[in-house]
Amino acid sequence: MNKNKRFAWKTQGVANKHNIISGNDWRFTVLTSRLIRMEFSNAGEFEDRATQIVFYRDFPDCTYKTQRQGTTLFIDTDHLHLSFDEAVGKESLQIHLKTLGVSWHYGQKLPPQLKGTTRTLDEADGSVKLEDGLCSRAGYTLMDDSGRLVLSEDGWFDRKKPEEDLYFFGYGHDYIACVQDFYRLTGAPSLL
């Protein structure tokens, strides 16, 4: 296939190795003290290419501590405490927000989110249903990047490796920092 020079984006999908903790079928990337990428793959294959949404995972070194007790992994940052039992799998995953004292468990329904934007106002006549946003009064949200296409080196879109790819945003009520780090991850939106 020919290289698509017209749509060759500058991306940095590969995360800083210092920020990665991994096992046979899982990988966690501590992007900031409040943003963690969580990947699960039965084949043990993980995706480092940029996706339709996530262009930049090359965040600087993040300060965190890891600890193991038997088969359970603990990751502590200034704001989050993650626990994961490798023997049980992703169903054991939970993240606790230290600042608000709330926890999220894998598979748990997310609390109501503050609304975001709509893609277009074309053909709108009156109110428009808004999509969920990144910010929540509960202090956390989850972005699922599993089904997105990846950007291949030749500038075309490609199918992603079969995996679950989640981003946990635990920013409490610091909505500005949440959106700033989202833009750091995705790139700033285009302006007209």
Question: Model-derived features: where do they sit?
Answer:
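Residue-level marker of intrinsically disordered, low-complexity segments enriched
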Residues: 18-19, 52, 93, 100
